[in-house]
């Protein structure tokens, strides 16, 4: 099932899962249980690879696992909260490293994400 945003002329054809990092839990003995990732929302996205100049600017390390995900606007997902979310796409996990509310229109978000394991921020 394809979702089309006619105003932006984009097809959201790829199902992705956004996960949110849960809170760490303190056990009865005072130790802490590591926080788990939990499914936050299933959405459809337009997915693109970085290319050209954009690829080289991002290329501080091996950025071949960097993708751009375009999704409908979601309140609360922004650059301040990006580390609390990650993306599951085609069996791989992606850490979000940039969120752009395109033209501040509150209609669509561009999420730049790096495949987990290709960055030191892999949690």
Where do the model's predicted regions map?
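N-terminal intrinsically disordered, low-complexity, charge/repeat-rich segments that act as generic
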Residues: 1-17
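Short, conserved turn/kink motifs that form compact alpha/beta structural patches or helix kinks used as
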Residues: 4, 20-25, 32-123
